[in-house]
């Protein structure tokens, strides 16, 4: 357990009972904050005051800056308390609220982000907004005090103008969500257009896409890998996709955006070379990037991809998990206080000298580019550790053996990491979010199979069982939060807020349950996936829109608060995989197992709803492209039956090469009976609980390969299995 540096302030406003880490961190502020809810809106309307809405996160550096500069300033607080009803929202806890006001502020100012600062009518419609405002005018931005007085004046003296602006903004975001995007064709050509849009932005020198700032885009990376490994040798995009995927993964893991000492990725890079990151670490980034590196190793057996994947798992295990109960924590902050910018993660040359003996220092300084002049604007002596060369390239350049350099690297890494652990540690938000945990479960189960890590499998299943027990009622209700981060003054073991699950929570959890069945053969996971998928359709799918909304329709006779009245159909990955393609993909997986054609029909209709516009989303359409591949390609199920070395060899062959439409499981023979496996597999493989085509006599292990609803005879030979799994087979 690592000590987090985070205040436990005395409550001075309406956040005294808040469960969210971000809201709890503001309890001491002189601003009379209120949580999002009926009471705050009723007060605004009864006093006819506009609302000041702050949306941020506990990991957000500029949120902390604005807190200290403005919200902890008594003069600013007096202005807010006099003229506004102040509402504070945690974007991790309420992604539905955040998404709508991000769209609104982007329509007003041309950009969104955190902190989000919006001025609303008493009923919650935005009439002005922006992101970070300094207390006093600088950075080309107006001072926050002047902004507050201006917005109060607009509401008091130019109310019609404010109401017209609010109506225009709401009409804009509702129009953007009411599009009819059908009209394209659901073919692999559409997938190619999405990939071509991403490849046009590929940076061949540094990897990644675009210039700066640079984000990883895991969805588009997996789509490029799918094209690189599963298209025919004459496909013109395959080679380009291969280069883009491998270059990007290599450059990211060598950059400062990757924690060279402990593993794990920071949120994004401020430069095109991946050197200087925003230092917060997010669970969802690391789980999706873990899948990228596992899939890369699965396909190309690249040792650096393996090393990065294992290091991500070790970092998550060490810092971001509840080892006893199961569960993955949400995030780690970038900073200790506002006067540093990633100081916990960075090093001056003198700091490195104090830890390393001369030989290791000489190596570390060259390998990680540690010098007198560093990389950070606030302290030019601070270096972000990054690698300009691989260890093999470094060995060739220096004349040393790679084995000797590996010894130096391991020793220097251990010493620097031990010294870093003595520093005050950035706060870890130990809130356990349902959707993000489902993503982590998927990543761990994939890694466990490909990398043969039983510990990852065991922890993923412990977490999945906890999710089923604590976030799901066993029927239609799934909560957004499994458990909040514990607090010394408010012990929290179960959610105090019953935040309903979003589409993404349901869709990611259905995927995790399907993966739970593939990992164990236990039918409880399969049956739960079916039940939750049905609930997802009932709650979020619209027959009129032929797509999924991100939240449930309001109950009859009720009106959603504020901008929640605008319905959203998420299709772009930003930053997690989008809800509609994720839900469609989950339904396609279940259709392949259950034979329930309505799942396929809904998935196809959903993808068709966006087919006329999705190619324009480029980097943000990776999940859509993968879901479309899954729709167009026959599912491939590989079931390895048996145990021992023969089964292990067959399983190793089966998992080689990533393919979106392929799933692999190893199962005990006693489960291969009617009722012991999903309906389609039972129909294809069994006849009156006996194999339709029995395995060879005496075979201790064999593989069953099913494409669609056609299964090959049992395979015992490794070479025959390789041939059966060729993309053109």
Language-model segments: residues:
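Extended, hydrophobic alpha-helical segments in both membrane/secreted and soluble proteins
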Residues: 59-63, 261, 265, 286-289, ...
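Short coil/turn connectors between adjacent alpha-helices in alpha-solenoid helical repeat scaffolds
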Residues: 230-239, 451-454, 519-524, 595-597
